[in-house]
Amino acid sequence: MVGGGSAQKLTTNDALAYLKAVKDKFQDQRGKYDEFLEVMKNFKSQRVDTAGVITRVKELFKGHQELILGFNTFLPKGFEITLQPEDGQPPLKKRVEFEEAISFVNKIKTRFQGDDRVYKSFLDILNMYRRDSKSITEVYQEVAILFRDHSDLLVEFTHFLPDTSATASIPSVKTSVRERGVSLADKKDRIITPHPDHDYGTEHIDQDRERPIKKENKEHMRGTNKENEHRDARDFEPHSKKEQFLNKKQKLHIRGDDPAEISNQSKLSGAVPSSSTYDEKGAMKSYSQDLAIVDRVKEKLNASEYQEFLRCLNLFSKEIISRPELQSLVGNLIGVYPDLMDSFIEFLVQCEKNEGLLSGILTKSKSTYLLQGEGKYPQPSLDNDRDQEHKRDDGLRDRDHEKERLEKAAANLKWAKPISELDLSNCEQCTPSYRLLPKNYPISIASQKTEIGKLVLNDHWVSVTSGSEDYSFSHMRKNQYEESLFKCEDDRFELDMLLESVNSTTKHVEELLTKINSNELKTNSPIRVEDHLTALNLRCIERLYGDHGLDVMDVLKKNVSLALPVILTRLKQKQEEWARCRSDFDKVWAEIYAKNYYKSLDHRSFYFKQQDSKKLSMKALLAEIKEITEKKREDDSLLAFAAGNRLSISPDLEFDYPDHDLHEDLYQLIKYSCAEMCSTEQLDKVMKIWTTFVEQIFGVPSRPQGAEDQEDVVKSMNQNVKSGSSSAGESEGSPHNYASVADSRRSKSSRKANEHSQLGQTSNSERDGAAGRTSDALCETAQHEKMLKNVVTSDEKPESKQAVSIERAHDSTALAVDGLLDQSNGGSSIVHMTGHCNNNLKPVTCGTELELKMNDGNGPKLEVGNKKLLTNGIAVEITSDQEMAGTSKVEREEGELSPNGDFEEDNFAVYAKTDFETFSKANDSTGNNISGDRSREGEPSCLETRAENDAEGDENAARSSEDSRNEYENGDVSGTESGGGEDPEDDLDNNNKGESEGEAECMADAHDAEENGSALPVSARFLLHVKPLVKYVPSAIALHDKDKDSLKNSQVFYGNDSFYVLFRLHRILYERILSAKVNSSSPEGKWRTSNTKNPTDSYARFMTALYNLLDGTSDNAKFEDDCRAIIGTQSYILFTLDKLIHKFIKHLQVVVADEMDNKLLQLYFYEKSRRPETIFDAVYYDNTRVLLPDENIYRIECRLSTPAKLSIQLMCNGLDKPDVTSVSIDPTFAAYLHNDFLSIQPNAREDRRIYLNRNKRKVCREDEQLYSTDEVKIKNGLECKIACGSSKVSYVLETEDLLVRVKKRRKTLCHNQDSWVRQMRLQYYKNNFL
């Protein structure tokens, strides 16, 4: 069929465009599109001529002029389709307005005021239609019954119906309104439900009026009977889901629930045909039988039971209850009638086969029951029933014959289609993929099926197609290497099949030729080759001769004895030729397999290379842990609230490190790559971070350094000291160099002393602008405060220390030491002691030096007169000598913060007892002895630490011991090594005996009191110097024995985003190297290496290939091939190792150069230098928060177990966020605070009296501090707030100071005369001389 009707030549695109237009037009009616395709296939196969195609297309596209005219383009000349104007088409309905619908409902309500049943029934019908429980046909039918005597309402109701063919098929105006309504329902029921005039057993409404309509339908049916038969036989298709045999011309769904579909169908077909089809005849017969069962049930049951029966059927039709449940419910009603129950079960079987049957019966039964219940209409007479029964039987008999004939004609048409085009959706289902073929479907008989095949092979269950032509199954994408292997396999298979076929044919031809030569076969009768050679043998012979195969087969069949020898020679010739070709191709195929096998197995490397760079980016790694943290944030907040907002440890990421030896390989890789990428100076810094920080986190033993490495370290540290930028991460990072670096700093303390004196005399504005100088001043005053507390507590034993609570936190959180380690150009370092972040100033001592805790407490030191102000606001008198001594001490400890000495003992002792601690009296030992004991107590810990650090060799141990001797000779010993190494008696004889200004104040004795001229009582004067002896650490963060043991086996580090990415990259590198090591030693890897000529260690070969890639000896392609050969299919993650290592080293360089990262390293080494019993995780965390107030903080912990476990947690600051660190304080407010508010004026002067020396010695021989606090319990918990603007002081609620003195028992008077005389003398002395 050539498109001659068009001026220009048609192309394939024109045909595709037309098909797309047809498909779009009938997207909701897929059957029409499929039928159009079937018409085109029939024309292509010459089953239908051009005229037949035109006829079918006109029928299919009726109502769509654009499609019909567009089809003319593809018709030859002389076959154009001409359209005639269609007469009698009803005009389009006017759109119904909402106000009209409201008016119509109100009219119904007004009309039936006296009968609310009609109005409620009308609303129920509409609601059921809205819920898709009723079709539009059922709605019209029931409304017509309700408005039986109100024709005007029924006519008006038809205007609200969808624009379907039902409304278009209403008869002329001459017919009465009642006849029009009944005719409409009659015609619609032919499509969806049985005709209402066949409602046997129920009342027939106005049968006389229906007779003209039936007659008209009957005449029309006779006129179109032949045409329908022809079309039904030709166009029959089994795609209808509701009935097996449906008229092709109607193309309507059996239920027709959707008004839109009915409207669309009416537009396509013009109008619903008024005649019934032959399929309806069989349906009517079945319908009458099923309805008779319902009538029988109605006769047996009363009204209520029958209503219950209909309700059960309704529930079953809506699939609310199952069939067994329905049988159980109905059995309770009609179970006493066995024959009726059996008929009902058969009725259910028929309902399952025809889904529209039950709904139609329910509609008829409900309508009839409704009318009969009202009693308005009389029952039909028995004579009318008999007449209707005879007429019905005659009509059904004719229809049965017609249906049988139609089925026979359709069987030859529809079952000729392939199974893939059948609609098996209603057939029995075995699995989601298999359906049972219909019983009347002709099954092809397999010719070569054996007995076993008949038992096991399937002929009735077919696999249904899933999807459509728009959705094809997506196979796995093959790479180019697989394509090469597949091509080889195809060629090899083809050649194998040829060889096997030739060998088999040769064998059978030889056997047949032998039989002929030995006269085993009778030569009188012709020999049938098919009896001795199989179909495959004959096909091989035919293929052997190519185009002349058919001629050879004819010769073979005519003269077997002459043709067989020639054919056998040809077969053997081809057999040798193909065998030789096979051996040659085996070598080619083997080479192709060797080159492409491992590459063909690699399906992931291509995508892995594209995504790996994104996954290794800092943004992706941060997003990963943030996503995990956000999921846990809600639960963690609830836990934190329940625990008093304490620190919650719940790792977000956890990793195992099973192979400890792998750290050595990582070290060698990093060192080798750094030599290729970094300069000498960068190499030293990067490797120092690696060895002293990264490896120590994972518990890798320290690496010994050679002489060259030590010289490099000393040079680099000297350069750092000269430039004034000392880093704790570099000075304390390596345990071996800790003492030597400290000595190099101590040697420069005298030269730096003057610089720090000048820093102490600068103005406030200079301090505000210079953070480094401020840090030095704070470090100096912190050390003075430390020495002051050491002297105050000189008479107490370590096991009976006095505990004073310096702070009462509202949320029971831990006390902390916030260390602001500011490594700036000035090389300063700050250590500030503070508690829980709070907005309150807290008095922590009583007496002349009232210490106030501020929420940030990191402000600079100010000078007011001759007093130096610490950040917490304490004024301390400092002499010039003491100032020099203190300055030199700060210089010695600059950049080297080691809290192992008395500083930690006195300020971080943990007390898990009650709030009140009893101050026990010390023995007769003086403060000097206590101080000496403490110095001896502090030395072993330092020696042990130094011995552990220098245990690598005798040379380092000798050097450290020599350094310690130099320290003692120079008299420059800090609290790190000795809390009071010098004798306190020597301090009284020398001007420079005090190591801090606090020491000078607290060594005052009776002679100092006389020189100062103070006349206070002894006890009052002692109380002026009572200070908190130790910082109180709540039991919430106190380490128990179990925690201490776990702390020894773990390393905790708090870092920022940079360190988190560092450890993640380390983990990824470790994981990939471990994968290479594990997979190379797997059984598959051993099998690969055993096949090689020189089997070696697979892992060593891999490392060699990796080093060759890093130094440029080999390229990436060579490295990938080596990895595939050594490791196998899991090697794809190793293809980007060079990029990962380079990224890792660049990140290490960033960490080394970043100032904040160095501060975090310095803080880590500072916390690590504590003794285990004085380490608190919360303290370390709070110190980190001071450094990173607005940044993410990560808790990185490595448990040195087997295997080692690394856990990473993104900490959530929550409500306890530290305030911004203060940098200055108003001088006016500071002067008021210390000169007025904190100043103490003695109430009365102490009278000068004469004391006997023996009495004076008796009182003064004991420690003055213990004398004033004898049997006293003290708790300092009172807190106050001072507004800097108004200087207003307010006390914090629920805080208090307590001082409790336990009463002594009164001594009973001794009856001994001597004791009585002694007491009398003592009383006389007190009355007259005291």
Curated annotation (Swiss-Prot):
UniProt entry keywords in alphabetical sequence: Nucleus, Phosphoprotein, Repeat, Repressor, Transcription, Transcription regulation
Protein's cellular compartments: Nucleus
Biased composition (Low complexity): 723-734
Gene Ontology CC, one term: nucleus
GO-annotated biological processes: negative regulation of DNA-templated transcription; response to abscisic acid
Matching InterPro entries: HDAC_interact_dom, PAH, PAH_sf, Sin3-like, Sin3_C
Coiled-coil annotated spans: none
Keyword Transcription annotated: yes
One Gene Ontology term of the molecular function aspect: transcription corepressor activity
Ranges annotated as biased composition (Polar residues): 262-277, 920-932
PAH domain mapped to chain residues: 8-78, 94-164, 283-351
Annotated segments matching region Disordered: 191-281, 373-401, 718-775, 789-808, 882-906, 920-1002
Domain of life: Eukaryota
Biased composition (Acidic residues): 980-989
Residue positions, PTM Phosphoserine: 996
UniProt biased composition (Basic and acidic residues): 191-246, 383-401, 789-800, 933-949, 956-968
Entry annotated with the keyword Transcription regulation: yes
Function of the protein: Acts as a transcriptional repressor. Interacts with ERF7 to repress genes in abscisic acid and drought stress responses. The heterodimer represses transcription by tethering SNL3 to DNA.
Free-text comment about domains: The PHA domains are required for interactions with ERF7 and HDA19.
PANTHER family from the UniProt entry: SIN3A, ISOFORM G (PTHR12346:SF0), SIN3B-RELATED (PTHR12346)
Further remarks about this protein from its record: Loss-of-function mutant (antisense inhibition) leads to abscisic acid hypersensitivity in germination.
Assembly behavior: Interacts with ERF7 and the histone deacetylase HDA19.
This protein's name: Paired amphipathic helix protein Sin3-like 3
Organism: Arabidopsis thaliana (Mouse-ear cress)
Taxonomic placement: Eukaryota, Viridiplantae, Streptophyta, Embryophyta, Tracheophyta
Gene assigned in the entry: SNL3
